[in-house]
């Protein structure tokens, strides 16, 4: 049941915690909700165990456990995701189930960067998480100031290695557990009353100032995946679909892109729920009437887009999660030359997989980067999500990490 109405007064930003298992991501998430709730009674405080038993959700046919919490700072409203298991992170980031405008990388000061720290940073780079803020957790367990400096240096170097601005991004040191315990003892702990709670505020300040407010979907260039096509006698051809981003107006020029040669046309009408409109915007399900376009010139799987804003491509590097047998995926490995269907937006296109040097095969449950060559072009850009299917069954999920040709 909805808990009150959503007040859209502050800009909305999506964030999440990433980092190695047991470094304190979930404890930090709990501490943030308690910290924000101390000054804003509308925020729901969530204890560790409430976040940890995250509900299952499905994205692109894949089951993922994700906890969603929300909180406000004086300037913004945040949606924050936290995943219980490493596999959930991989799946979440690749499917884009929880799009992040920025991430909080949690590193235990007692252990320094660990294998999943590296993996999550690489994933963030591959799937296009644009900003990272670091929270060095458990500093109360480290007595040696030099050791803390060493860990900070290591984390910064690791981030730079994966093309994040490691030297410049904010690193906040604190203890999520100490802050949470202080807030559980006194839920009204305000800023300036406890040094550990203040570190959480410092983190929130860094997230507020370092992660920019994302561009709204309506401000981006127009794109609409075509779901269906039909003819209106005497008026012409209508393409229907949900506008993914931007705005389209009557008399706009648009390109029809993908699957065949790009064609330019003019929008002569827009309708929604059988009513005529002047424009359609991100989120609207519309029918777009196209001038001089025959019924056979446009098909499901193409996109309508602002001319020059997106190009058709066939070859790309993909970051992929392959479903395990238990998740309904393949029961056996696949090899180079594997030819499944790649489901982009509204249609399947066959493609051939080329594995990286030194990789013989890919097992169910693997997270891997490989090159795909499609038999037909698709309107494509970095960050585009897709499913991998065999005979209509999802066997993997991926994201375009790099467009090649």
From Swiss-Prot:
Pfam families: GTP_EFTU, GTP_EFTU_D2, GTP_EFTU_D3. It comes from the Bacteria. GTP hydrolase that promotes the GTP-dependent binding of aminoacyl-tRNA to the A-site of ribosomes during protein biosynthesis. Residues 19-26 are annotated as: G1. The keyword Magnesium applies. Residues 175-177 are annotated as: G5. Keywords: Cytoplasm, Elongation factor, GTP-binding, Hydrolase, Magnesium, Metal-binding, Nucleotide-binding, Protein biosynthesis. Residues 61-65 are annotated as: G2. It is found in: Cytoplasm. Residues 82-85 are annotated as: G3. Its EC number is 3.6.5.3. GTP binds at residues 19-26, 82-86, 137-140. It comes from Deinonema sp. GO terms for molecular function: GTP binding; GTPase activity; translation elongation factor activity. This is Elongation factor Tu. GO terms for cellular component: cytosol. It is an enzyme of class 3 (hydrolase). Belongs to the TRAFAC class translation factor GTPase superfamily. Classic translation factor GTPase family. EF-Tu/EF-1A subfamily. Residues 10-215 form the tr-type G domain. InterPro entries: EF-Tu_GTP-bd (IPR041709), EF-Tu_GTPase (IPR050055), EFTu-like_2 (IPR004161), EFTU_2 (IPR033720), G_TR_CS (IPR031157), P-loop_NTPase (IPR027417), Small_GTP-bd (IPR005225), T_Tr_GTP-bd_dom (IPR000795). Monomer. Its main location: cytoplasm. Mg(2+) binds at residue 26. Residues 137-140 are annotated as: G4. It catalyses: GTP + H2O = GDP + phosphate + H(+).
